[in-house]
UniProtKB/Swiss-Prot annotation:
Pfam families: VWC2L_1st, VWC2L_2nd, VWC2L_C
Domain VWFC: 153-212, 216-274
Protein name (database record): Brorin
Matches recorded under InterPro entries: VWC2/VWC2L, VWF_dom
Biased composition (Basic and acidic residues): 44-56, 64-78
């Protein structure tokens, strides 16, 4: 009887304690969810700590009497059942807290791993900023490829291809062929053909330069003329655009005039003698074909030979004795 009474009293006190906790929780809905989540874990954590300190031997000793005594085992099961029944209100309390507005924090607790709090993230960011760009590792520049030294063994062109000694090769796309020797490439410049004088575009990508475009016109005094075109610059001057791009001009050959006072007319190349053939008698101009008395004692005339007037600028003059009055 005394043991039954004690058990009844214990059960009643446990029920009263659970009822009081529920009333306090319902009256105060602002209890942090973290404390509610940590509350059921504390007994288990203390048990694990005791178990780790006591060791597996102590746990076996505690479990053996419970298996040996059937009645005690049943009491333990009944007590554990009552403990589970007491935990049911805690789960209902969590659901009520989530429905009252604590869902966001509860979600944070489920997503965020233990120890990864906003304070820890802020400290990590501050530590990263404190390092600064000075201590940050800088990438090393890539090493340039260095061709090995093939002197005495071969020759290398611009692309890195190796040629054996005695082989002919072109060091580059615009280089002339070379002979690979033990001393290095031996290159001889061949005799290249001369470029056209009218070439205006030269290709130098090969060993010998080549003309890709020639000029087919001439420029003379601000005007453009086609190849082999003839043109007149003045009445006496004719020009021609040659194949080499140069302009050659010739002046018309005018016959020698039969006078000493020729006149140039517009649009005519050669001068003409408007006053006919004549010549100079000292400073005076006398007509040809007759004798002209320049003074009382001097007679002059222009020379005439073989039917043409001989070009003599000065007349032939003879002086006679004359009486003085």
């Amino acid at each position: 009887m005394p043991s039954s009474t004690a058990m009844a009293v214990g059960a009643l006190s446990s029920s009263l304690l659970v009822t009081c906790c529920l009333m306090v929780a319902l009256c105060s809905p602002s209890i942090p969810l973290e404390k509610l989540a940590q509350a059921p874990e504390q007994p288990g954590q203390e048990k694990r700590e005791h178990a780790s300190r006591d060791g597996p031997g102590r746990v076996n000793e505690l479990g053996r009497p419970a298996r040996d005594e059937g009645g005690s085992g049943r009491d333990w099961k009944s007590k554990s059942g009552r403990g589970l029944a007491g935990r049911e209100p805690w789960s209902k309390l969590k659901q009520a807290w989530v429905s009252q507005g604590g869902g966001a924090k509860a979600g944070d607790l489920q997503v965020r791993p233990r120890g990864d709090t906003p304070q820890a993230e802020a400290l990590a960011a501050a530590a990263q900023d404190a390092i600064g760009p000075e201590l940050a590792p800088t990438p090393e520049p890539p090493e340039e490829y260095v061709y090995p030294d093939y002197r005495g063994k071969g020759c290398v062109d611009e692309s890195g291809f190796v040629y054996a000694i005695g082989e002919k090769f072109a060091p580059g796309p615009s280089a002339c062929p070379c002979l690979c020797t033990e001393e290095g490439p031996l290159c001889a410049q061949p005799e290249c053909p001369r470029l056209h004088p009218r070439c205006i575009h030269v290709d130098t990508s090969q060993c010998c330069p080549q003309c890709k475009e020639r000029k087919n016109y001439c420029e003379f005094r601000g005007k453009t003329y086609q190849t082999l075109e003839e043109f007149v610059v003045s009445p006496c001057e004719r020009c021609r655009c040659e194949a080499n791009g140069e302009v050659l001009c010739t002046v018309s050959a005018c016959p020698q005039t039969e006078c000493v006072d020729p006149v140039y007319e517009p649009d005519q190349c050669c001068p003409i003698c408007k006053n006919g053939p004549n010549c100079f008698a000292e400073t005076a101009v006398i007509p040809a074909g007759r004798e002209v008395k320049t003074d009382e004692c001097t007679i002059c005339h222009c020379t005439y030979e073989e039917g043409t007037w001989r070009i003599e600028r000065q007349a032939m003059c003879t002086r006679h004795e004359c009486r003085q009055m």
